[in-house]
Amino acid sequence: MLEHEQKNVWKMIGMRIRRERIKRNWSQSGLCYGICAVSYLSKIEQGKMEVSEEILKLLLERLELPWIDDKETKDLESFVEAQYEFLFTHPIQEFLKQKEIFQEKKEKLYSSSLIADACILEAVYESRKDEIEEGLERYLDFRQLAVLRMLQGRLDEAITLLPIPFMYMRAGEILYETGQNYASAISYLQMGYNLAAQEGMEMLMLQCRIIIGNCYSNQQELENMEREYQIASRLARDLHQTEILKVINYNRASTWVALGSYKKAYDYFSKVEEPAILDLHKLAICCEAYGRKAEGIEAVKRAERMGEFGDDPDDEKQLEVEMCRLVRYRLEHENYLKEEEYEKLLFPCFEKMKARLPVGFAVFHVPYVLEWYTDRRQYKQAYEMVRKYGGFIPVL
């Protein structure tokens, strides 16, 4: 480790000791009693001096934090490198599934020279943007800073720091999810695909093509969407990614629903062998369009049973069930637009979709919000919504 890097490590460890001391509401004199002078601890917390191994070990022990020896540090370094390798070669959703493994190592990482990596990796797992330890940013290396910039949505800075396929893919994915700029999203994703192909990163290639297809779907460009989904489907089959194939098929059929091709969509969703909640949601909407009330209600009930074991209100599955209940309410109440209970279901669900899901989910439900505004003669609100979502509003 270079001298300036070692100094940065001491500063970060000092910050950790200070944070843990304050968390426990301890004074400096209380922490360092019998170990070192208060002035010495003060300099340690400010990162102004190198800490002797013996004193550091005693301070960490008093704070009930683990002491990491050289051998364990090497093991942790290998773990951190493996984490970055997986992060940079897979879709972010796959990386997030490793959170439990990270949690097992977290405390040791925070007590080691890898504290900066611990902060950054935890920020990825927790989807933090601006909650990085105060004062830490100036000690980050280019890789750590690039990941932080990506989390903060400072996309060009992230790519400049680390121009790898993953960064281009994530930049495009973020722009797609927020609906900010589909043209830029597609440009980033195409570059990410090309770079991933050069390096043989098949999963990133697949992810880029799916998201490009999603961008075209949200813009209702069916021909371009179909081309991208066909490419993605070939890649998914070659990689034996059967679950991803289901996602592609769902996205395609959902676009048909949004464009009012209910017969085509019904033929697909009614034949899905093991439907997910969102498959049943779209099936219920198709049934609603065709007046198949009983079949639509049964689809929603099935979706509700699938989500009944979750008790976390922030769980994505619970939000999907809320979307299904909107359809059920319309199926069971002919004059739903006149009923206050429908309003209580519609608007909270719509706000959650905007906050927690890719923009396409909210766009899909815009017609139902417009329908309610129009019925209540709230034309100003309806106009503002049309202005915001432009020409990409689905057919009702």
Regions found by a protein language model. Give the residues of each.
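DNA major-groove recognition helix of helix-turn-helix/homeodomain DNA-binding modules
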Residues: 52-70
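Amphipathic alpha-helical segments of tetratricopeptide repeats
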Residues: 99-107, 136, 159-160, 190-201, ...
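Residue register of alpha-helical TPR repeats
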Residues: 117, 140, 147, 166, ...
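Residue at a conserved register position within TPR or TPR-like alpha-solenoid repeats
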Residues: 86, 119, 126, 149, ...
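Short alpha-helical DNA-recognition segment
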Residues: 24-43
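A short, Lys/Arg-rich alpha-helix, primarily the initiator
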Residues: 1-23
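Structural motif corresponding to the intra-repeat A-B loop/turn of tetratricopeptide repeats
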Residues: 89, 122, 129, 152, ...
